[in-house]
Amino acid sequence: MQTSNITNHERNDSSWMSTVKSTTEVSWNKLSFCDILLKIITFGIYSPHETLAEKHSEKKLMDSFSPSLSQDKMDGEFAHANIDGISIRLCLNKGICSVFYLDGDKIQSTQLSSKEYNNLLSSLPPKQFNLGKVHTITAPVSGNFKTHKPAPEVIETAINCCTSIIPNDDYFHVKDTDFNSVWHDIYRDIRASDSNSTKIYFNNIEIPLKLIADLINELGINEFIDSKKELQMLSYNQVNKIINSNFPQQDLCFQTEKLLFTSLFQDPAFISALTSAFWQSLHITSSSVEHIYAQIMSENIENRLNFMPEQRVINNCGHIIKINAVVPKNDTAISASGGRAYEVSSSILPSHITCNGVGINKIETSYLVHAGTLPSSEGLRNAIPPESRQVSFAIISPDV
Protein backbone atom coordinates (compact mmCIF):
# COMPACT_ATOMS: atom_id res chain seq x y z
CA MET A 1 0.00 0.00 0.00
CA GLN A 2 1.51 3.29 -1.11
CA THR A 3 0.19 6.68 -0.01
CA SER A 4 0.87 9.95 -1.77
CA ASN A 5 -0.25 13.52 -1.11
CA ILE A 6 -1.96 15.04 -4.12
CA THR A 7 -1.07 18.57 -2.93
CA ASN A 8 2.54 17.56 -2.29
CA HIS A 9 2.24 18.52 1.37
CA GLU A 10 3.74 16.24 3.98
CA ARG A 11 1.35 13.41 4.87
CA ASN A 12 -0.19 13.62 8.33
CA ASP A 13 1.00 10.52 10.27
CA SER A 14 -2.22 10.56 12.29
CA SER A 15 -4.26 9.96 9.14
CA TRP A 16 -6.35 6.84 8.70
CA MET A 17 -3.52 5.17 6.81
CA SER A 18 -1.59 4.77 10.05
CA THR A 19 -1.38 1.10 10.98
CA VAL A 20 -4.41 -0.30 12.79
CA LYS A 21 -3.64 -3.70 14.22
CA SER A 22 -6.24 -6.46 14.38
CA THR A 23 -5.62 -6.65 18.13
CA THR A 24 -6.42 -2.98 18.74
CA GLU A 25 -7.83 -2.36 22.22
CA VAL A 26 -10.02 0.48 20.99
CA SER A 27 -13.72 -0.32 21.27
CA TRP A 28 -14.96 -1.24 17.80
CA ASN A 29 -17.88 1.18 17.87
CA LYS A 30 -15.45 4.03 18.64
CA LEU A 31 -13.28 3.46 15.56
CA SER A 32 -13.56 6.04 12.81
CA PHE A 33 -14.77 5.01 9.37
CA CYS A 34 -11.15 5.40 8.19
CA ASP A 35 -9.94 2.84 10.73
CA ILE A 36 -12.71 0.47 9.70
CA LEU A 37 -11.91 0.92 6.01
CA LEU A 38 -8.26 0.17 6.73
CA LYS A 39 -9.28 -3.04 8.48
CA ILE A 40 -11.38 -3.98 5.46
CA ILE A 41 -8.53 -3.64 2.98
CA THR A 42 -6.17 -5.41 5.37
CA PHE A 43 -8.33 -8.43 6.14
CA GLY A 44 -11.58 -8.29 4.16
CA ILE A 45 -15.06 -8.50 5.64
CA TYR A 46 -15.15 -12.29 5.54
CA SER A 47 -11.80 -12.87 7.21
CA PRO A 48 -11.70 -15.30 10.17
CA HIS A 49 -9.96 -12.45 12.05
CA GLU A 50 -13.24 -10.54 12.25
CA THR A 51 -16.01 -10.93 14.82
CA LEU A 52 -19.68 -10.67 13.87
CA ALA A 53 -19.82 -7.15 15.36
CA GLU A 54 -16.84 -6.09 13.28
CA LYS A 55 -18.31 -7.60 10.13
CA HIS A 56 -21.57 -5.76 10.78
CA SER A 57 -19.78 -2.41 11.12
CA GLU A 58 -17.68 -3.10 8.03
CA LYS A 59 -20.69 -4.13 5.97
CA LYS A 60 -22.57 -1.01 7.06
CA LEU A 61 -19.66 1.15 5.89
CA MET A 62 -19.25 -0.66 2.56
CA ASP A 63 -22.99 -0.41 1.88
CA SER A 64 -22.40 3.35 1.59
CA PHE A 65 -20.55 2.87 -1.70
CA SER A 66 -22.48 3.27 -4.94
CA PRO A 67 -21.44 2.57 -8.54
CA SER A 68 -20.07 5.64 -10.33
CA LEU A 69 -21.87 6.84 -13.45
CA SER A 70 -19.97 6.85 -16.72
CA GLN A 71 -19.73 10.66 -16.77
CA ASP A 72 -18.19 10.63 -13.29
CA LYS A 73 -15.43 8.17 -14.13
CA MET A 74 -12.44 10.37 -13.37
CA ASP A 75 -9.21 8.37 -13.15
CA GLY A 76 -11.14 5.14 -13.70
CA GLU A 77 -13.53 5.78 -10.81
CA PHE A 78 -15.89 2.84 -10.30
CA ALA A 79 -17.35 3.55 -6.83
CA HIS A 80 -17.87 6.51 -4.55
CA ALA A 81 -19.24 7.30 -1.09
CA ASN A 82 -19.73 10.23 1.25
CA ILE A 83 -19.16 9.17 4.85
CA ASP A 84 -19.12 11.55 7.81
CA GLY A 85 -18.94 14.42 5.34
CA ILE A 86 -15.81 13.04 3.67
CA SER A 87 -15.85 12.13 -0.01
CA ILE A 88 -14.17 8.84 -0.98
CA ARG A 89 -13.57 7.62 -4.53
CA LEU A 90 -12.37 4.16 -5.60
CA CYS A 91 -10.52 4.18 -8.91
CA LEU A 92 -9.06 1.46 -11.12
CA ASN A 93 -6.52 2.67 -13.65
CA LYS A 94 -4.24 0.35 -15.65
CA GLY A 95 -4.97 -2.48 -13.27
CA ILE A 96 -4.02 -0.47 -10.17
CA CYS A 97 -6.65 0.44 -7.59
CA SER A 98 -6.37 3.74 -5.71
CA VAL A 99 -8.46 5.30 -2.96
CA PHE A 100 -8.92 9.09 -3.14
CA TYR A 101 -10.14 10.81 0.02
CA LEU A 102 -10.00 14.06 1.95
CA ASP A 103 -7.56 14.32 4.85
CA GLY A 104 -8.23 17.70 6.44
CA ASP A 105 -8.03 20.21 3.62
CA LYS A 106 -5.87 17.99 1.44
CA ILE A 107 -6.75 15.30 -1.07
CA GLN A 108 -4.88 12.07 -0.43
CA SER A 109 -4.33 9.16 -2.79
CA THR A 110 -3.65 5.67 -1.50
CA GLN A 111 -2.54 2.98 -3.92
CA LEU A 112 -3.61 -0.52 -2.89
CA SER A 113 -1.66 -3.72 -3.28
CA SER A 114 -3.28 -6.56 -5.20
CA LYS A 115 -4.33 -8.30 -1.97
CA GLU A 116 -5.73 -5.08 -0.48
CA TYR A 117 -7.62 -4.33 -3.68
CA ASN A 118 -9.20 -7.77 -3.74
CA ASN A 119 -10.14 -7.52 -0.06
CA LEU A 120 -11.83 -4.20 -0.82
CA LEU A 121 -13.54 -5.49 -3.95
CA SER A 122 -14.91 -8.60 -2.25
CA SER A 123 -16.34 -6.42 0.52
CA LEU A 124 -18.37 -4.13 -1.74
CA PRO A 125 -22.18 -4.41 -1.55
CA PRO A 126 -24.05 -6.56 -4.13
CA LYS A 127 -24.37 -3.83 -6.75
CA GLN A 128 -23.18 -3.76 -10.35
CA PHE A 129 -19.79 -2.04 -10.27
CA ASN A 130 -18.24 -1.56 -13.69
CA LEU A 131 -14.57 -2.48 -13.38
CA GLY A 132 -13.74 -2.17 -17.08
CA LYS A 133 -11.76 -4.51 -19.30
CA VAL A 134 -8.54 -4.20 -17.35
CA HIS A 135 -9.83 -6.45 -14.60
CA THR A 136 -8.35 -9.94 -14.84
CA ILE A 137 -9.92 -13.03 -13.32
CA THR A 138 -8.09 -16.14 -12.24
CA ALA A 139 -10.01 -19.42 -12.17
CA PRO A 140 -10.07 -21.29 -8.85
CA VAL A 141 -8.18 -24.47 -8.23
CA SER A 142 -10.29 -27.35 -9.48
CA GLY A 143 -9.95 -31.02 -10.24
CA ASN A 144 -11.46 -34.46 -10.04
CA PHE A 145 -9.61 -37.53 -8.94
CA LYS A 146 -9.96 -40.80 -7.09
CA THR A 147 -7.13 -42.35 -5.18
CA HIS A 148 -6.45 -45.23 -2.84
CA LYS A 149 -3.95 -43.13 -0.90
CA PRO A 150 -4.77 -42.37 2.75
CA ALA A 151 -6.43 -39.10 3.59
CA PRO A 152 -3.33 -37.22 4.79
CA GLU A 153 -1.82 -37.42 1.30
CA VAL A 154 -4.74 -35.58 -0.29
CA ILE A 155 -4.99 -32.85 2.33
CA GLU A 156 -2.63 -30.58 0.39
CA THR A 157 -5.00 -30.71 -2.59
CA ALA A 158 -8.10 -30.34 -0.46
CA ILE A 159 -6.77 -27.35 1.43
CA ASN A 160 -6.48 -25.35 -1.79
CA CYS A 161 -10.23 -24.88 -1.88
CA CYS A 162 -11.54 -25.61 1.59
CA THR A 163 -11.59 -24.12 5.01
CA SER A 164 -12.42 -25.93 8.19
CA ILE A 165 -15.35 -26.45 10.49
CA ILE A 166 -12.82 -26.60 13.32
CA PRO A 167 -12.95 -23.04 14.74
CA ASN A 168 -9.55 -22.87 16.42
CA ASP A 169 -6.45 -24.78 17.49
CA ASP A 170 -7.96 -26.16 20.68
CA TYR A 171 -8.86 -29.38 18.91
CA PHE A 172 -6.60 -32.20 17.89
CA HIS A 173 -4.57 -32.02 14.69
CA VAL A 174 -4.69 -34.67 11.98
CA LYS A 175 -2.18 -37.47 12.55
CA ASP A 176 -0.22 -39.50 10.03
CA THR A 177 -0.74 -42.89 11.68
CA ASP A 178 -3.50 -45.22 10.51
CA PHE A 179 -6.58 -44.79 12.70
CA ASN A 180 -4.53 -43.85 15.77
CA SER A 181 -6.31 -40.49 15.81
CA VAL A 182 -9.82 -41.83 15.22
CA TRP A 183 -11.13 -41.18 18.75
CA HIS A 184 -9.71 -37.67 18.82
CA ASP A 185 -11.10 -37.01 15.34
CA ILE A 186 -14.71 -37.78 16.27
CA TYR A 187 -14.37 -35.94 19.59
CA ARG A 188 -13.09 -32.71 18.02
CA ASP A 189 -15.67 -32.82 15.20
CA ILE A 190 -18.67 -33.32 17.46
CA ARG A 191 -17.33 -30.69 19.89
CA ALA A 192 -16.91 -28.22 17.00
CA SER A 193 -20.33 -28.88 15.50
CA ASP A 194 -22.48 -26.87 17.88
CA SER A 195 -23.78 -24.96 14.84
CA ASN A 196 -25.09 -28.20 13.29
CA SER A 197 -22.42 -28.24 10.61
CA THR A 198 -22.21 -32.04 10.88
CA LYS A 199 -25.06 -34.25 9.68
CA ILE A 200 -25.19 -38.01 10.25
CA TYR A 201 -27.66 -40.33 8.52
CA PHE A 202 -28.46 -44.01 8.81
CA ASN A 203 -30.48 -45.38 5.89
CA ASN A 204 -31.47 -41.75 5.14
CA ILE A 205 -32.72 -41.21 8.71
CA GLU A 206 -30.91 -38.33 10.40
CA ILE A 207 -29.37 -39.15 13.75
CA PRO A 208 -29.56 -36.14 16.11
CA LEU A 209 -26.12 -34.70 16.87
CA LYS A 210 -26.97 -34.47 20.58
CA LEU A 211 -27.66 -38.21 20.55
CA ILE A 212 -24.25 -38.88 18.98
CA ALA A 213 -22.56 -36.59 21.51
CA ASP A 214 -24.19 -38.50 24.38
CA LEU A 215 -23.20 -41.81 22.74
CA ILE A 216 -19.51 -41.00 22.41
CA ASN A 217 -19.48 -39.62 25.94
CA GLU A 218 -20.95 -42.87 27.27
CA LEU A 219 -18.38 -44.81 25.22
CA GLY A 220 -15.64 -42.91 27.04
CA ILE A 221 -14.43 -40.91 24.04
CA ASN A 222 -12.94 -37.69 25.36
CA GLU A 223 -9.84 -35.52 25.02
CA PHE A 224 -7.85 -37.83 27.30
CA ILE A 225 -8.68 -41.18 25.65
CA ASP A 226 -5.81 -43.50 24.74
CA SER A 227 -5.56 -43.72 20.95
CA LYS A 228 -5.01 -47.49 21.17
CA LYS A 229 -8.03 -48.10 23.39
CA GLU A 230 -10.64 -50.61 22.20
CA LEU A 231 -14.11 -49.31 22.97
CA GLN A 232 -16.22 -51.45 25.25
CA MET A 233 -19.72 -52.00 23.93
CA LEU A 234 -22.54 -50.50 25.94
CA SER A 235 -25.11 -52.54 27.80
CA TYR A 236 -28.81 -52.35 27.00
CA ASN A 237 -29.39 -50.25 30.11
CA GLN A 238 -26.67 -47.75 29.12
CA VAL A 239 -28.07 -47.40 25.61
CA ASN A 240 -31.62 -47.15 26.91
CA LYS A 241 -30.59 -44.29 29.22
CA ILE A 242 -29.11 -42.36 26.27
CA ILE A 243 -32.18 -42.97 24.11
CA ASN A 244 -34.66 -41.94 26.80
CA SER A 245 -32.75 -38.74 27.55
CA ASN A 246 -33.09 -37.69 23.90
CA PHE A 247 -36.61 -38.88 23.08
CA PRO A 248 -39.85 -38.38 25.06
CA GLN A 249 -40.55 -41.71 26.75
CA GLN A 250 -44.33 -41.51 26.33
CA ASP A 251 -44.31 -40.24 22.74
CA LEU A 252 -45.19 -43.13 20.41
CA CYS A 253 -44.10 -41.09 17.38
CA PHE A 254 -40.46 -41.88 18.16
CA GLN A 255 -40.87 -45.59 18.87
CA THR A 256 -39.38 -46.66 15.53
CA GLU A 257 -36.32 -44.42 15.96
CA LYS A 258 -35.84 -45.53 19.56
CA LEU A 259 -35.88 -49.21 18.61
CA LEU A 260 -33.54 -48.58 15.67
CA PHE A 261 -30.95 -46.63 17.64
CA THR A 262 -31.13 -49.07 20.56
CA SER A 263 -30.17 -51.86 18.17
CA LEU A 264 -27.48 -49.90 16.32
CA PHE A 265 -25.74 -48.59 19.42
CA GLN A 266 -25.14 -52.16 20.64
CA ASP A 267 -23.62 -53.30 17.32
CA PRO A 268 -19.80 -53.07 17.30
CA ALA A 269 -19.74 -52.84 13.49
CA PHE A 270 -22.04 -49.81 13.54
CA ILE A 271 -19.90 -48.12 16.20
CA SER A 272 -16.87 -48.88 14.01
CA ALA A 273 -18.63 -47.43 10.95
CA LEU A 274 -19.66 -44.30 12.84
CA THR A 275 -16.32 -43.53 14.46
CA SER A 276 -14.20 -44.39 11.42
CA ALA A 277 -16.20 -41.90 9.33
CA PHE A 278 -14.49 -39.10 11.26
CA TRP A 279 -10.97 -40.46 10.84
CA GLN A 280 -8.69 -37.81 9.32
CA SER A 281 -11.78 -36.43 7.61
CA LEU A 282 -9.94 -33.59 5.89
CA HIS A 283 -10.83 -31.02 8.53
CA ILE A 284 -8.10 -28.46 9.08
CA THR A 285 -7.89 -25.84 11.81
CA SER A 286 -8.89 -22.41 10.58
CA SER A 287 -5.55 -20.84 11.51
CA SER A 288 -3.74 -23.20 9.15
CA VAL A 289 -5.81 -22.13 6.14
CA GLU A 290 -5.87 -18.36 6.56
CA HIS A 291 -3.35 -17.92 3.76
CA ILE A 292 -5.40 -20.21 1.51
CA TYR A 293 -8.50 -18.24 2.49
CA ALA A 294 -6.80 -15.01 1.39
CA GLN A 295 -5.67 -16.64 -1.84
CA ILE A 296 -9.19 -17.76 -2.72
CA MET A 297 -10.57 -14.31 -1.98
CA SER A 298 -7.83 -12.81 -4.16
CA GLU A 299 -8.24 -15.09 -7.14
CA ASN A 300 -11.99 -15.37 -7.47
CA ILE A 301 -13.78 -12.06 -7.44
CA GLU A 302 -15.84 -11.38 -10.54
CA ASN A 303 -19.36 -12.62 -9.95
CA ARG A 304 -19.29 -12.50 -6.16
CA LEU A 305 -20.53 -8.90 -6.47
CA ASN A 306 -23.81 -10.28 -7.79
CA PHE A 307 -24.58 -12.29 -4.66
CA MET A 308 -26.02 -11.33 -1.32
CA PRO A 309 -23.43 -11.08 1.46
CA GLU A 310 -24.55 -14.22 3.26
CA GLN A 311 -23.89 -16.16 0.06
CA ARG A 312 -20.34 -14.90 -0.05
CA VAL A 313 -19.26 -16.27 3.30
CA ILE A 314 -16.43 -18.62 2.47
CA ASN A 315 -16.02 -20.41 5.80
CA ASN A 316 -19.33 -22.24 5.63
CA CYS A 317 -18.71 -25.97 5.80
CA GLY A 318 -20.63 -29.13 6.39
CA HIS A 319 -19.57 -32.67 7.25
CA ILE A 320 -22.05 -35.19 5.87
CA ILE A 321 -21.85 -38.82 7.01
CA LYS A 322 -24.10 -41.45 5.47
CA ILE A 323 -24.16 -44.99 6.84
CA ASN A 324 -26.28 -47.60 5.09
CA ALA A 325 -26.89 -51.18 6.14
CA VAL A 326 -25.74 -53.63 3.47
CA VAL A 327 -28.71 -55.54 2.08
CA PRO A 328 -27.97 -59.30 2.02
CA LYS A 329 -27.98 -60.96 -1.39
CA ASN A 330 -30.13 -63.84 -0.15
CA ASP A 331 -32.51 -64.63 2.65
CA THR A 332 -29.91 -66.32 4.84
CA ALA A 333 -28.52 -64.75 7.97
CA ILE A 334 -26.58 -61.56 7.37
CA SER A 335 -23.53 -63.05 9.07
CA ALA A 336 -22.65 -65.97 11.26
CA SER A 337 -22.66 -63.68 14.27
CA GLY A 338 -26.03 -62.19 13.38
CA GLY A 339 -24.49 -58.76 12.75
CA ARG A 340 -24.53 -56.70 9.58
CA ALA A 341 -22.12 -54.83 7.37
CA TYR A 342 -22.30 -51.11 6.67
CA GLU A 343 -21.44 -48.87 3.74
CA VAL A 344 -19.95 -45.55 4.84
CA SER A 345 -19.74 -42.30 2.91
CA SER A 346 -18.08 -39.34 4.61
CA SER A 347 -18.06 -35.97 2.82
CA ILE A 348 -16.93 -32.49 3.72
CA LEU A 349 -18.79 -29.83 1.75
CA PRO A 350 -17.30 -26.38 2.21
CA SER A 351 -18.92 -23.58 0.24
CA HIS A 352 -16.56 -21.32 -1.63
CA ILE A 353 -16.31 -18.58 -4.21
CA THR A 354 -15.63 -19.40 -7.86
CA CYS A 355 -15.64 -17.33 -11.00
CA ASN A 356 -19.06 -18.84 -11.71
CA GLY A 357 -20.47 -17.86 -8.35
CA VAL A 358 -20.95 -19.87 -5.20
CA GLY A 359 -19.92 -23.50 -5.49
CA ILE A 360 -19.25 -26.53 -3.36
CA ASN A 361 -16.07 -28.54 -2.92
CA LYS A 362 -17.00 -32.16 -2.36
CA ILE A 363 -14.31 -34.25 -0.69
CA GLU A 364 -15.69 -37.73 -0.17
CA THR A 365 -14.40 -40.94 1.36
CA SER A 366 -16.36 -44.19 0.94
CA TYR A 367 -15.70 -47.73 2.14
CA LEU A 368 -17.27 -50.89 3.61
CA VAL A 369 -17.25 -51.94 7.26
CA HIS A 370 -17.73 -55.68 7.64
CA ALA A 371 -19.94 -57.32 10.24
CA GLY A 372 -18.19 -57.89 13.54
CA THR A 373 -15.55 -55.18 13.04
CA LEU A 374 -14.27 -54.19 16.47
CA PRO A 375 -14.15 -50.47 17.36
CA SER A 376 -10.41 -50.08 17.94
CA SER A 377 -7.60 -48.55 15.92
CA GLU A 378 -6.24 -52.04 15.22
CA GLY A 379 -9.67 -53.43 14.36
CA LEU A 380 -10.39 -50.58 11.97
CA ARG A 381 -6.93 -50.86 10.42
CA ASN A 382 -7.40 -54.57 9.73
CA ALA A 383 -10.98 -54.26 8.49
CA ILE A 384 -10.60 -51.10 6.39
CA PRO A 385 -7.33 -51.26 4.41
CA PRO A 386 -6.20 -48.10 2.59
CA GLU A 387 -7.10 -49.55 -0.81
CA SER A 388 -10.74 -49.83 0.27
CA ARG A 389 -10.97 -46.09 1.00
CA GLN A 390 -11.75 -44.07 -2.12
CA VAL A 391 -11.20 -40.35 -1.69
CA SER A 392 -12.64 -38.11 -4.39
CA PHE A 393 -12.34 -34.36 -4.72
CA ALA A 394 -14.48 -32.22 -7.00
CA ILE A 395 -15.88 -28.75 -7.44
CA ILE A 396 -19.61 -28.48 -8.06
CA SER A 397 -20.55 -25.09 -9.48
CA PRO A 398 -24.06 -23.83 -10.27
CA ASP A 399 -25.10 -22.86 -13.77
CA VAL A 400 -25.05 -19.11 -14.32
From Swiss-Prot:
Single GO molecular function: cysteine-type endopeptidase activity
One of the record's GO cellular component terms: extracellular region
Tubulin-binding domain: region residues: 224-315
Principal subcellular localisation of the protein: secreted
Record text on activity regulation: Inhibited by the cysteine protease inhibitors leupeptin and cystatin-C.
Keyword Secreted belongs to the record: yes
Keyword terms of this UniProt record: Hydrolase, Plasmid, Protease, Secreted, Thiol protease, Virulence
Assigned EC number: 3.4.22.-
Gene Ontology annotations of biological process type: proteolysis
Pfam family, one: EspG
Induction of expression: Transcriptionally activated by VirB and MxiE, in association with IpgC, upon invasion of the eukaryotic cell. Induced at 37 degrees Celsius.
Protein purpose: Alpha-tubulin-specific protease that is required for entry into epithelial cells and for subsequent intra- and intercellular spreading. Contributes to bacterial entry into epithelial cells by inducing microtubule (MT) destabilization and the formation of membrane ruffles. The membrane ruffling evoked by VirA results from the activation of host rac1, which is associated with the destruction of MT networks. Creates a tunnel inside the host cell cytoplasm by breaking down the microtubule infrastructure.
Quaternary context: Monomer. Interacts specifically with alpha tubulin, a major component of microtubule.
Protein name: Cysteine protease-like VirA
Taxonomic classification: Bacteria, Pseudomonadati, Pseudomonadota, Gammaproteobacteria, Enterobacterales
Designated gene of the protein: virA
